[in-house]
Structure formats: C-alpha cells, structure tokens
C-alpha cells in the first residue's frame, strides 16, 4: 500500500513492514511474517519492480514477527542488516522470556490467528547478516540512518530516511497493542527492558520526519516528538 511518495507498507495494523522506492532501487525495513512474501511480490509488481531491485533489508530488531521472509531474501542475494546487539537473536531465535502483560481474548486470538495465516510457525532464522551500529548511514537507497533504540531488545533500532520524511521504529513503540487491541501511541508489549525502552524514545525527538512507522499499528502522521509525548502520556 502506498503511503506517500517513495513510501509503501506491507501487511496491516497487526504486523507491518515497509518499502522505500527510489530510482536507484528499493530499501526494505523489516520482513514481517513469512506469508508477507506474497504481499511483497504484489507491491513490487504494482511498482513494475522485482526482488532484483531490492538493494537491502534493514531489520529493526531480531524478533520473529519482523524477520519473516528475511532469510528468503538473503538467499536471493539481498543483504540483511541488523544491529550487532541483535545479531545472535536473529541467527538463533534465542531471547529472554518476557511477561506477556495485559491481554484481551479477541485481540489476542486475532494476533495469533493472523500469524498462523501468514505462516508465522515457518519463520526461518537468518544465517548471515551485516552488523550495524548507532549512527551508521547505510549505502542503500534513501541513505537510511541507524538510530539505536535499546530496550525492546538490546539491538532495537529506528531507521531514519529523510528523503521519505519517515522514521521506522519497529517495536520501540506501538500504535496498536496487539494483545489488547488498544489503539494509540503506547509502549510495545514483549519488551526486554521497559525502562530502557522509554528512555530511548528521547532519541526520536530531534529527528525531522512527518511519518512515524511502527511494526504494529497504524502509521503515525506527525512529528516524532509528538508521538513520543503521546507514548509518555499513555496510561
């Protein structure tokens, strides 16, 4: 789905990934669930493009609902980038257990049902990745800037792409709680260190963007500082 010039979304408010389309090629941010491969093909076809036009995939972190088709892309020759602190997680799936937190039955069933329909149980770990660090500017379409956002995981990042006026935040925050169905900017569930995650939000406030794009929930149309204020004000 086209959001704006150069900017497209795969998936929906339950699980989303993003595509930046420029004349020099395509940059992907996150890889959703394995079944989002078909969504990717449809979006590429609508653009008159193919997997051969994808120059790189940046993962905001290493959780399974963000790496769905990453290994498939890697095997097709697309480099996969992730923060060094999440490289082990994306290669092995090993992560600390976190409390699930509040949940409501219908949103919970919707989340897991969507995962099953999108082949979540078939997610493959990514065998080879290129490790990145806070402040790196990647040689990919849009010159994406890596912004370290530790908390949800040690290697969680945001990805700032000025030409698209967008910052992709992964699970640094959410605009729809996948377990309760509550909408609006708020902390994301399944977070390793909630205090650190909230502290990391300060790193977004100075970024210039008109889109804040989470891995779960509707796109936020407005300044990063405004969404950070909304998260901090959430009950």
Question: Where on the chain are the PLM-derived regions?
Answer:
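Metallo-beta-lactamase
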Residues: 33-35, 121-127, 137-139, 143-150, ...
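Conserved beta-strand hairpin/beta-sheet module of binuclear metal-dependent hydrolase folds
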Residues: 1-47, 51, 158-174
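Short, electropositive alpha-helical surface patch
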Residues: 221-235
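Active-site HxH/HxHxD metal-binding segment of metal-dependent hydrolases
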Residues: 45-130
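Residue-level marker for buried hydrophobic side chains located in beta-strands
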Residues: 27-29, 58, 80, 166-168, ...
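Short alpha-helical
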Residues: 15, 35, 64-65, 88, ...
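Short, structured coil segments at secondary-structure junctions
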Residues: 3, 75-76, 208
